[in-house]
C-alpha cells in the first residue's frame, strides 16, 4: 500500500472504533467481527503495514465503509456523534503523542496485556476490561475528555464502559 493508502486505512481504523463506540453506547451491541480486529490492533507493535494491524483490510471494512460515507456526506443526523468521536479521538491522539512518558506507560501495559490476550476469542470482556484500566490510568488523566452520548442503561453497564474505553484507546 502507498503512504496515502496506509493513512486511509489508519483513519478507517479510527472511524471503525468511533462507529462501534456509538453502537455500544446506544444499543449495547457490537459487531464482534469488527470489535476483535479493533481491539487486537492495540497489540500490533511492529508490522509492515497498517492493514496488518487489523489482520488485513477486511478487519477494517466497517471503518472503510464509514469513512467513505462520511467523506461523501452520505450519513444522516444519527451519525453526527460518530464524526465527533473521530475528530475527538484524533485530537486526543495528538495530546497523547506529545507525552513520551505516557506513551511508554501505555505501551508497557499493552505489552503485558497482550500476553493475556493471546487467546482472545471468547475473552472479549476480560481483554476490554484490562485495556479499559490502561485508558483510565493514562489518557483519562488528560485535560481533554471525549464525551460519549448514548443510553444511560448502556453507558452505565460496566461491560459496555470497558468496551468503549478500550476502543477509545
Where do the protein language model's features map onto the residues?
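Charged, amphipathic alpha-helical oligomerization/scaffolding segments
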Residues: 9, 13-20, 84, 88, ...
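Long amphipathic alpha-helical segments with strong coiled-coil/leucine-zipper propensity
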Residues: 42-123
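Helix-start/N-cap signature of alpha-helical segments
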Residues: 3-10, 78, 82, 164
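Short amphipathic alpha-helical segments and their helix-coil junctions
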Residues: 1, 62-75, 141-157
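Alpha-helical oligomerization segments
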Residues: 159-169
Amino acid at each position: 500500500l502507498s503512504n496515502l493508502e496506509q493513512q486511509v486505512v489508519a483513519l478507517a481504523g479510527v472511524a471503525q472504533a468511533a462507529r462501534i463506540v456509538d453502537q455500544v453506547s446506544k444499543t449495547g451491541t457490537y459487531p464482534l467481527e469488527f470489535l476483535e480486529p479493533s481491539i487486537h490492533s492495540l497489540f500490533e507493535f511492529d508490522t509492515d503495514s497498517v492493514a496488518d494491524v487489523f489482520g488485513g483490510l477486511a478487519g477494517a471494512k466497517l471503518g472503510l465503509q464509514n469513512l467513505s460515507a462520511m467523506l461523501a456526506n452520505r450519513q444522516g443526523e444519527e451519525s453526527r456523534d460518530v464524526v465527533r468521536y473521530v475528530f475527538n479521538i484524533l485530537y486526543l491522539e495528538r495530546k497523547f503523542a506529545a507525552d513520551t512518558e505516557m506513551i511508554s506507560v501505555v505501551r508497557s501495559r499493552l505489552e503485558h496485556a497482550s500476553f493475556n490476550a493471546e487467546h482472545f476469542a471468547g475473552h472479549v470482556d476480560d481483554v476490554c476490561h484490562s485495556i479499559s484500566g490502561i485508558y483510565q490510568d493514562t489518557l483519562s488523566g488528560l485535560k481533554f475528555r471525549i464525551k460519549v452520548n448514548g443510553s444511560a442503561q448502556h453507558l452505565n453497564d460496566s461491560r459496555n464502559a470497558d468496551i468503549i474505553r478500550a476502543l477509545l484507546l
